[in-house]
């Protein structure tokens, strides 16, 4: 368990630093398009998590430290949107279409609402 925690932590640092670097680079080069870095890391993170998940399905012998380190740590540090996308896809693939659509809708609109509420609380 300690090895898994270390793998997630170390890989998480790498993902977080990559996200920070992308944001810094975009801000320096395109300050009016601040959202481009978030969009890019979210899409790239989704691609990476899809590839990793597929590879790990094909190779179940890959140790949990590596799987958790890469998916939860690295991709999770890079973006949490990728985890949401994978969860939604897994629900769809298992035939739980209404649940997947509800989960996606609540995640997107609930997240926007929660962000707005949080911001509003700072303006009281």
Swiss-Prot record:
Give the UniProt record's GO annotations in the biological process aspect. Answer: cellular detoxification of fluoride
Q: Write the record's keywords in alphabetical order, separated by commas.
A: Cell inner membrane, Cell membrane, Ion channel, Ion transport, Membrane, Metal-binding, Sodium, Transmembrane, Transmembrane helix, Transport
One Pfam match: CRCB
Gene Ontology cellular-component annotations: plasma membrane
Q: Which residues form a coiled coil?
A: none
What job does the chain carry out? Fluoride-specific ion channel. Important for reducing fluoride concentration in the cell, thus reducing its toxicity.
The record's annotation in NCBIfam families points to:
PRK14234.1
First-listed, main subcellular location of the protein, grouped into a coarse class: membrane
Q: How does it sit in the membrane?
A: Multi-pass membrane protein
Give the organism's phylogenetic lineage.
Answer: Bacteria, Pseudomonadati, Pseudomonadota, Gammaproteobacteria, Pseudomonadales
Q: Which family does it belong to?
A: Belongs to the fluoride channel Fluc/FEX (TC 1.A.43) family.
Where does the sequence pass through the membrane? Answer: 5-25, 38-58, 69-89, 99-119
Activity regulation annotation text: Na(+) is not transported, but it plays an essential structural role and its presence is essential for fluoride channel function.
Which catalytic reaction applies to this protein?
fluoride(in) = fluoride(out)
Cell location: Cell inner membrane
Q: InterPro entries annotated for this entry?
A: FluC (IPR003691)
Asked whether the UniProt record includes Cell inner membrane among its keywords, one would answer yes
Q: What molecular function terms (GO) are annotated for this protein? A: fluoride channel activity; metal ion binding
Q: Which residues bind Na(+)?
A: 76, 79
What protein name does the entry list?
Fluoride-specific ion channel FluC
């Amino acid at each position: 368990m300690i090895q898994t925690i270390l793998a997630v932590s170390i890989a998480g640092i790498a993902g977080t630093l990559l996200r920070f670097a992308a944001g810094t680079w975009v801000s320096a080069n395109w300050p009016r398009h601040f959202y481009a870095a978030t969009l890019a890391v979210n899409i790239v993170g989704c691609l990476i998590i899809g590839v990793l998940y597929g590879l790990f399905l094909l190779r179940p012998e890959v140790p949990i430290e590596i799987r958790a380190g890469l998916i939860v740590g690295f991709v999770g540090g890079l973006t949490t949107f990728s985890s949401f996308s994978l969860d939604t896809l897994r629900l769809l693939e298992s035939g739980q279409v209404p649940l997947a659509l509800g989960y996606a809708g609540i995640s997107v609109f609930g997240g926007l609402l929660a962000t707005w509420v949080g911001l509003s609380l700072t303006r009281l």
